Structure formats: structure tokens, C-alpha cells
């Protein structure tokens, strides 16, 4: 069967359901595909198909994750749902499936629960830009005042974690009523909450800035000296674009200030390129730079767009021994390797006050101090390695130095 062509007619946005176990994330995901399928804008994916999610590997970690896709009149969406709580944490930290926005699912009879808080905190730390709330199972509550109290509590929780709690749309409904309805009429009352939710997601979650429109950044993977022409660095452009004549900085892996140089050529597959853009694997020719003055692990970037740092806070998931991780806990002062972009850098871990040790399977915020500064920013993801195997995954939550 011929593959369908992906038509890029609408802006593409990545979303996902988050929230406490059994509050209805998977039921809601299935209900969205069901209701939008009535408009021909999705393929229905059942609860069981989502619940039995396939496993994927990201940064050496196995995660059960289900991707569904659907469209509204305005956008094309990729939506992720994870069956288990640990899978959520691993997904958010590894960025296996990036989220441009999240749908926080909260059961009205229960209100916000521990995992509700944990997912909101993580969403903040991994820089999920916006959130919409689906207040589920409202058909089990007949007291309007209680519903309003739950909404107030949710807005307060969001505000406490750095989201604009007063502005976040809260849509009430019942995902199960929508999913189990036999009606084929899109205007059936039980489908209204799903359409209202998608409208809120369309309106409130911003269309992400395309990577190509951000300042140029390319992690350096390899360095070659070319006789008579100078030094070429190769890598995959992470964001932005680059062309001959651009001024760039070489950042990280040294205690000296970043060096500026001028791009004298861009090549791809041995051919000259007018302009390299995000996603391209390119070679960049640099003026006046010796082969020995640049190395793997540094980045090439638009001047002033990213700075080298050695000390930062990070949210980390520590692999269990069944996942190939450590068998024993570690303590403050532990010195593993941090695999950042294209290379390993040694660093020391400082645990928060009152935390004695970290067990395999834990999710924790810690401070990391690298032996040499590298180009780092909030939201950057990394792996923690020991003797070449991955023992943890992390995301930078704040720069300290």
C-alpha cells in the first residue's frame, strides 16, 4: 500500500494528556479521536489500543507511549498519552515526545491529587509553554459549589507552579459519556465538552515558534582540517539557519570566553549550500580557526544567544536496575558523566537539603556542577552515564552560576 503524503496545510502542534492515575487521561484521549472522527478529522483509537501502548526508547530509557493524531479546523495535532505514571515522568524528562501544550485531566469528585501536582511541577520544569484543564466526571457531581471549589483549588495549584492560573481555560465534561455514546450526531450534548475542549486548545495553546526562526545553534560532532581552506566543523543544525558571511561563536568545553569567527562556507553531502537550516546535517567552514582550537561537545551559535555554564539545577529520573540502571543508591558528591548534546562531561551532584540519597527509580531535583562550562539553557535535556551506560536522564530547570 502506498504511503499517504503528509500534507502540511495547517500549523502542527504537539500536545499530551497529563494528570493523576485513573482521572481519565486515556478515556479522554480515546474520546477526542472518536468525536473528531465523526467530522472525518481523526481515526478513532480505542481505550485498549491506547492503554496497551508500545514501548519506545529515548536516551537509553524504555517508555510506554501512545501517539494519536487528529485535526481541528485550525490545526494538525500529535497527541501523546502514557499508560503509567513512571512513563509520564520519563517522557517529560527525556523529551521523547515534546509537548507544545498539555491537557491536564482532573477528576471532579477527587480534585487535584499528588500526581496532579507532580505532573504540573514537571510541566513547569521541562518548559511546557501552556496548559488547558479538562475537569472530568462532572456528571458524578450535582453540587455546583463543590465544582467551583475544585476549580479554585486547581487555579491556585497552577499559579503556585508558575502557570497563569486565573487565565487557564477549564472545560467541564465527562470523557466516558462521550466515549460510550452511540450517537453519530456531532451535535449530541455528550460531545459538546470534547468540542469545547478542542476549541480551548486551539485558542489557548500558542502555535510554537518554528525551530528555523530561532537563533542559530549547531552542536559540533566532528572537526576536520582542510589544507588551504581552514577548519570544517560538522553537525546537525538544532535551530535557526546559517550561511556564508555569518558571524558565529564557538561556545563551551573551555574556561575561556567564547570565540567569534566568520562562516566562509556551508556544505551538505559534499555540495555547497546557500543556507543550512534546522534539521540539516552540514559542514561549516570557519575563518581563522585552527583544527586544534575547536572540539566535539562545543556548539556553534549566533553571538549572544547561548552562554557557557558549569552549574545548574536539573530534574532527574534515575533508572531502576531492571531498566539497566544502578543497583545501589548514590549520594551528594557522586561524580558521573553528563552526556550533553554530543559529548560526556564529568560533573558532581549536590542533593537538596534533607535528601540523604537517591534510589534507582527516583525522580528528583538536584544541582549539578560540571568540571568545565558548556553551552546550557533551561529546558536542555541530557543523560547521566557511568562507564558508558545510561543511569539517568535529566532536564535543566534553572541556571545557577
Swiss-Prot record:
Residues covered by region (G3): 81-84
GO molecular function, one term: GTPase activity
Annotated Mg(2+) binding sites: 26
InterPro entries with a match to the protein in the record: EF-Tu_GTP-bd, EF-Tu_GTPase, EFTu-like_2, EFTU_2, G_TR_CS, P-loop_NTPase, Small_GTP-bd, T_Tr_GTP-bd_dom
Segments forming domain tr-type G: 10-209
The organism's place on the tree of life at top rank: Bacteria
Pfam families reported in the protein's UniProt record: GTP_EFTU (PF00009), GTP_EFTU_D2 (PF03144), GTP_EFTU_D3 (PF03143)
One of the record's GO cellular component terms: cytosol
Location of the region described as G1 in the Swiss-Prot/TrEMBL record: 19-26
Enzyme Commission numbers on file: 3.6.5.3
Binding site for GTP: 19-26, 81-85, 136-139
G2: annotated span: 60-64
Transmembrane segments: none
Region (G5) residue spans: 174-176
Chain spans, region G4: 136-139
Subunit text: Monomer.
Family: Belongs to the TRAFAC class translation factor GTPase superfamily. Classic translation factor GTPase family. EF-Tu/EF-1A subfamily.
HAMAP family: EF_Tu_B (MF_00118_B)
Functional note: GTP hydrolase that promotes the GTP-dependent binding of aminoacyl-tRNA to the A-site of ribosomes during protein biosynthesis.
Protein name, entry field: Elongation factor Tu 1
Protein encoded by which gene: tuf1
Amino acid at each position: 500500500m502506498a504511503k499517504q503524503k503528509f500534507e502540511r496545510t495547517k500549523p502542527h502542534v504537539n500536545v499530551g494528556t497529563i494528570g493523576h492515575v485513573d482521572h481519565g487521561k486515556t478515556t479522554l484521549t480515546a474520546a477526542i479521536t472518536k468525536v473528531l472522527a465523526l467530522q472525518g478529522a481523526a481515526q478513532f483509537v480505542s481505550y485498549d489500543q491506547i492503554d496497551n501502548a508500545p514501548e519506545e526508547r529515548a536516551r537509553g530509557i524504555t517508555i510506554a507511549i501512545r501517539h494519536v493524531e487528529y485535526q481541528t479546523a485550525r490545526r494538525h495535532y500529535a497527541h501523546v498519552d502514557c499508560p503509567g505514571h513512571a512513563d509520564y515522568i520519563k517522557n517529560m524528562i527525556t523529551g521523547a515526545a515534546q509537548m507544545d501544550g498539555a491537557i491536564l485531566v482532573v477528576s471532579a469528585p477527587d480534585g487535584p491529587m499528588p500526581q496532579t501536582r507532580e505532573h504540573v511541577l514537571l510541566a513547569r520544569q521541562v518548559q511546557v509553554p501552556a496548559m488547558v484543564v479538562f475537569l472530568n466526571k462532572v456528571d458524578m457531581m450535582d453540587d455546583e459549589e463543590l465544582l467551583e471549589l475544585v476549580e479554585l483549588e486547581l487555579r491556585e495549584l497552577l499559579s503556585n507552579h508558575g502557570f497563569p492560573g486565573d487565565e487557564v481555560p477549564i472545560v467541564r465534561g465527562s470523557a466516558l459519556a462521550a466515549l460510550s455514546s452511540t450517537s453519530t450526531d456531532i451535535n449530541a450534548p455528550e460531545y459538546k465538552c470534547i468540542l469545547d475542549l478542542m476549541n480551548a486548545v486551539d485558542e489557548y495553546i500558542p502555535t510554537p515558534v518554528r525551530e528555523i526562526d530561532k537563533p542559530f545553534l549547531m552542536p559540533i560532532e566532528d572537526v576536520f582540517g582542510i589544507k588551504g581552506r581552514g577548519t570544517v566543523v560538522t553537525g546537525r543544525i538544532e535551530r535557526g539557519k546559517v550561511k556564508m558571511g555569518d558571524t558565529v561563536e564557538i561556545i563551551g568545553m573551555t574556561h575561556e570566553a567564547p570565540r567569534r569567527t566568520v562562516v566562509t562556507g556551508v556544505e551538505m553531502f559534499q555540495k555547497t549550500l546557500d543556507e543550512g537550516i534546522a534539521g540539516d546535517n552540514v559542514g561549516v567552514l570557519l575563518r581563522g580557526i585552527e583544527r586544534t582550537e575547536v572540539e566535539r561537545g562545543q556548539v556553534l551559535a549566533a553571538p549572544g544567544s547561548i552562554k557557557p555554564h558549569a552549574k545548574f539545577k536539573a530534574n532527574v529520573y534515575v533508572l531502576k536496575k531492571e531498566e539497566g540502571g544502578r543497583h545501589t543508591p548514590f549520594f551528594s558528591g557522586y561524580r558521573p558523566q553528563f552526556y550533553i548534546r554530543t559529548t560526556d562531561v564529568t560533573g558532581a551532584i549536590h542533593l537538596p537539603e534533607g535528601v540523604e540519597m537517591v534510589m534507582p527509580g527516583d525522580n528528583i531535583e538536584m544541582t549539578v556542577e560540571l568540571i568545565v562550562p558548556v553551552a546550557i539553557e533551561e529546558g536542555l535535556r541530557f543523560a547521566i552515564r557511568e562507564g558508558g551506560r545510561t543511569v539517568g536522564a535529566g532536564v535543566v530547570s534553572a541556571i545557577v552560576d
